[in-house]
Amino acid sequence: MMKHICALLALFLFCSVRLLAKVYVLSIGIADYPDKKNDLRISDNDAKTIAKVFKATNEAFVSVMLNEQATKAALISRIRSVFANAQSDDAVVLYFSGHGSPGALVCYDGLLTYQSIYKEMKVCRANRKIIIVDACYSGKMRTNNQRSSYFDTQNVMLFLSSRTNELSQETRYKNSLFTIFLERGLRGGADKNKDRKISAREIFDFVHQGVITASGDKQHPVMWGKFNNEMTIIKW
C-alpha cells in the first residue's frame, strides 16, 4: 500500500513540475573576446538581464553562458542539453548578445554558423521556438543564401536586432539599445491587450518602434519566420 502511495505521490510531483516547466531559455552574452580589440562593453550584461526576466516567471528553466564559457563546442553542447528537455507544448528561447558576422554568430573562439543553429533547432520538439540575436549584421540570419527552408515550414520566430547592413548600438547604460526595449517589453511594456501575456507580434511592435525612435532611424529590428503572431513568448 505504501509503495502505491509513494508511486502516486511521485507521479503527482512529476506532473506538477512538468506543468510549470514550459519555457527553456539559453541566454548567451560575450563581451570579453580573446583579442581585446574585439571586446564589447555590455553584451554579458544583456544576457544576464534577459535571463533575469525569464527567471522571474514560474515557467522557465534558464541557463546562462558568459564570455569564455561560450565557445563554439560548449554552446552547441548546451543548446542540445537545455532544449532536449522541451516537449511539444513547450517553448524554447535562444538569446545571444555579442559580435555578429555575415552568416554566423561570433563565439568566444570562432564562428557558429546559422546553419549549425538551424540543425540544432530542427531536432528540438518544442512547438514554439524563439531565436533572439542582438548583434551587428544579425539581419543576415534571414537573408543568407544557404538559409535552410526549415524556417519557412516550422514554428520558429527569428527576432534580430538590426538589418543586414546595420550596426546594433551599445549605450552608456547597462544594456544595448535593442535589449533595453526587449526587457521593457517582456516585463509588460509590450502587453497591448493587457492579458498578462506577451505575444510575438506585441514584442516585435514594441521593440521595433522603440529602437527605431531611440536610434534616430539608424537601427531597425527585424522579425522573420513562419509562426503564429499570437504565439506567447512570456507570461509576466
At which residue positions do the language-model features occur?
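Cysteine endopeptidase catalytic domains of the caspase/legumain-like
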Residues: K3, V17-W236
